[in-house]
Amino acid sequence: MSNHHSKTKKTSMLGREDYIYSHDITNKNKKEKLNGASKNNDYNQDDDDETMKSKMMDFCDKTTAHGAKRVLIARNSFSKLMWGLIIFSFLLMFAYQASKLIFKFSAHEKITDISLKFDDVEFPAITFCNLNPYKKSLVMMVPSIRDTMDVYDNAKTHSKSEGEKKKPKVSRKQHSDASQQMVRELFAKEIEEGMVELKKSNKTLQSQNKSGRRRSQRSIENRRYEAIEAHCKCVGNIGMECIRFESPPRDPSSKCICTYDRDMEVAWPCFNISVWYDHECPLCHDDGYCESTLPSGTTSSDKWPCMCRNRGDTSERDDTPYCIGKAGVGKIEIRKLWLENNMTTTSTTTTTTTTPPPTTTSTTTTTTTTPPPTTTARPNQRAIVSNPETIKAMGFQGMTDGVAMLTRAKENLMFTMAALSDKQRIALSQSKHEFIEMCSFNGKECDIDEDFRLHVDPEFGNCFTFNYDVNNNYTSSRAGPMYGIRVLLFVNTSDYMSTSESSGVRLAIHPPTEYPFPDTFGYSAPVGFASSFGIKKKVMQRLPAPYGECVETKKVVDRNYIYAGYDYHPEGCHRSCFQNGLIDDCSCGDPRFPVPEGYRHCSAFNATARTCLEKNIGSVGDFHHITQKMDKCVCKQSCEEIIHEVTFSCSKWPSGATDLGDCDGMTESECEQYYRLNAAMIEVFYEQLNYELLQESEAYGLVNLIADFGGHLGLWLGFSVITVMEVCVLLVDMISLFFKSRHEEKLLRQSTKRKDVPEDKRQITVGSGRKSDAFVSI
């Protein structure tokens, strides 16, 4: 009775279907035990109860996954089929979703977080360079450099004569005259009607019987440009441009003649008075520029008073000199700039005492040109200058464009300088105290000797780096131009080489441990201005592989990296690959970049090396773009990079109230003009003391994968972590049962063989069987 009561209670606790399923399993297990007990085998028959089928049924009965149990407790085959299809469909859906999750995880996507950091901001290193790399007065003392410049000067002279022979060059003035003539033709009717109306309304016109001389004089006075005498300081070659002052000249040697613009009230350019000569030009244009001779086939009886000078540095008079009309009275009188500025009414005349150069051409209607292929721009040149191999190596053959020739001359200068030692190149460029006159940082005076370090650049010569010491780094306490670096730099334009197109300063902003690269990442500041460079700091932190490709280590140990002693930079990597490729092919390197230890740069005068270099540069292309020839070179970004964004502004400098430096023997106005033409004020400062942190992070990591994987398991199959553990236990049991059944089958076969052996041989067989059993038990 009690047994029946307990059975009823158990049935009520379980569901009906669960009870039936459990009862069937119990009866089935009992039957299997009875059948197993009836068999007479040599091994334990109780292990047969743990069959794979019973394990699966027991798992489905007790698992926390609800779907599998529904198949086994279904009342009919249709229900089992439906539940099986549903579970299988959900299993496929889960597999699809799981594959997408795995694909998303394997893509290693990343996101960039941007945040503002308020912390101490270290001031970057600033490298200052003169746009003129070497002093003209010094480089012309070195034979190899002088030869390089002579080849350039000869090429310029030759290209001008060749251009005149092939196709006469049309001047800007001739283009302007042609445009005026076209307008006259297009608007001839309107112009004629306007002139008729003007004549009718103007009854006070001057008589037309005045002399042609006075008419010519009056026309000159109304034109825009004229020659004017001024006070100048001329330094260097006599043909170089002079520095003009507003004050009267102290002596005749300080006089110069300038081209005066009436509209702008500016006198520029100015040249020493000794290079000018008086002339009577047969033709002067409406703007004031004159022609020393008439074009072929034209005649004129006019005689316009003008001042002329040679366009080149030669002492002989040019066939086409630069001429500008005079507005003074008489043949050799000229207006004085200092009198115009002081607005004096006293008429002061000065007679020029310069001796005009010997005239080699007569003023006729026909002109002759002498072909100058063998003419040199400067006398007493060495034989190597006219050597055909030298001319071929320099690459001026066939060039007529002045800009292209200047670019080529700059390259040739770098080739020549690369053959010199560092000590020799340093001596030819500006020294620290010549270049840097004044400096302050954070409102305090700098120590020019200690705070600036020399940096020799292949293109800009001597450069000087501020804040180069990592162990003693400057930090800005405030934002604004007053609390950064303010430096007065003297570039001395009077000593500029002919290859320097513009006057000013080149600066690069970079971390102290990185190479400056002023040619690529630099900024230019002109003379005569206070240039302000406001900077904002950004820190970029990139993820390494597998999320991205970046270089984690800053120190470079590769011997092929040509910028030894500096941190890794992608620009340095590209240049190193480019340079090493050229060395492999030509056995010499490009002078724009350093060479590894034991190698040399290509010679400027070696045509074979230059040809090989040009050929390889043409095949490789820009060293920033990897081609098939550089496919082995992989240049990655740094994992941590400091970026400085720069904004530029400028104002005219000096103001007139500025306390300037070395102005011995000059008035205040002369000193101001002197510095305006030769110096630049530079300000570099932080616009704000916070900085942006751009940090990469993984967009989908392992934690996200596990969470989404578990969510889909629970959604489609009703699985949890416990269910996963149950499946793992089931797999272990199934594997152990498989190997156990294989072992028992082996024992059964051995037992069967012993029964078939004759009795006289069974002892040996039994012994061997025991040995096998012992081996299995081990």
From Swiss-Prot:
Residues 346-369 have a biased composition (Low complexity). Glycans are attached at residues 202, 209, 272, 342, 473, 492, 606. GO terms for molecular function: ligand-gated sodium channel activity. Keywords: Glycoprotein, Ion channel, Ion transport, Membrane, Neurodegeneration, Sodium, Sodium channel, Sodium transport, Transmembrane, Transmembrane helix, Transport. Residues 154-180, 201-220, 346-380 are annotated as: Disordered. It comes from Caenorhabditis elegans. It is a multi-pass membrane protein. The gene is deg-1. Residues 104-711 are extracellular. Residues 154-165 have a biased composition (Basic and acidic residues). Residues 1-82, 733-778 are cytoplasmic. This is Degenerin deg-1.
